């Protein structure tokens, strides 16, 4: 099974590292082309494009300017330890054992606007470039057109090398749109997390994001390799709801706390 998750806007380049092992991203040639593109933007243009404050725009203009393709532990950090959003709060990779990192490196992939597809131990330099932004580039009007089939092809290559045919989609809609399901040589399974609010079960963004991380951790810690094993997921009060689930959409619910 190959797990797909989204990246995070919040980054951490300060905390102690849980591992010193690292690999290099596999799509850096494409990242370099995007960097060349965004370096042509002024900080005010970045602010408008990304809908962020002037301060954040200045920071990211500096990041784009400082970015260089020779990644070392001195100027970069492993992706799984650099991202720090709600998904990564659930994942808690900073507590992984060496064996957990091994399994994650094989079975977990992070989608990224700048890097395309990252393995957990791939080094990355700090950036902000969300997949959904409309960044004009030589390949089209946005990042979906820029990446085209590249991410899907890389996923197919990974699946083939592992003799695998199952992808667990724990990514957001914005990021999963960079994958072409019809061209993916795999069965796609999407876990959905519903929380009870005022007697009704619905997707609550913060909880759902964290649950995607919890599910990723559950798969990694328990070395799960078959989709039917996912139904045992019970972290932080979630339970599998067979009645509302389908073969390709597994529904997990949690009662109001």
UniProtKB/Swiss-Prot annotation:
InterPro entries: YaaA (IPR005583). GO terms for cellular component: cytosol. Pfam families: H2O2_YaaD. One of its GO terms (biological process) is response to hydroperoxide. NCBIfam families: PRK02101.1-1, PRK02101.1-3. Belongs to the UPF0246 family. This is UPF0246 protein YaaA. It comes from Salmonella arizonae (strain ATCC BAA-731 / CDC346-86 / RSK2980). The lineage of its organism: Bacteria, Pseudomonadati, Pseudomonadota, Gammaproteobacteria, Enterobacterales.
């Amino acid at each position: 099974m190959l797990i797909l998750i989204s990246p995070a806007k919040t980054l951490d380049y300060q905390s102690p590292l849980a591992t010193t092992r690292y690999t290099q991203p596999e799509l850096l040639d494409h990242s370099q082309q995007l960097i060349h593109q965004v370096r042509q933007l002024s900080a005010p243009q970045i602010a408008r494009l990304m809908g962020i404050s002037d301060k954040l725009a200045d920071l990211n203009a500096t990041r784009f300017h400082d970015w260089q393709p020779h990644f070392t532990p001195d100027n970069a950090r492993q992706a799984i330890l650099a991202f720090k959003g709600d998904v990564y709060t659930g994942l808690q990779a900073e507590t992984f054992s060496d064996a957990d990192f091994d399994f994650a490196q094989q079975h977990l992939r992070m989608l990224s606007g700048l890097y395309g597809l990252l393995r957990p131990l791939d080094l990355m330099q700090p950036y902000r470039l969300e997949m959904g932004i409309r960044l004009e580039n030589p390949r089209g009007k946005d990042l979906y057109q820029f990446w085209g089939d590249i991410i899907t092809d890389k996923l197919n290559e990974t699946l083939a090398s592992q003799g695998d045919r199952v992808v667990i989609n724990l990514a957001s809609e914005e990021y999963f749109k960079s994958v072409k399901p019809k061209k993916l040589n795999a069965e796609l399974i999407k876990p959905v997390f519903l929380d009870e609010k005022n007697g009704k079960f619905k997707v609550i963004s913060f909880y759902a994001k964290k649950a995607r991380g919890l599910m990723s951790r559950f798969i990694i810690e328990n070395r799960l390799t078959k989709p039917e094993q996912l139904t045992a997921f019970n972290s932080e009060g979630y339970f599998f709801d067979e009645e509302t689930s389908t073969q390709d959409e597994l529904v997990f619910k949690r009662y109001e706390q």
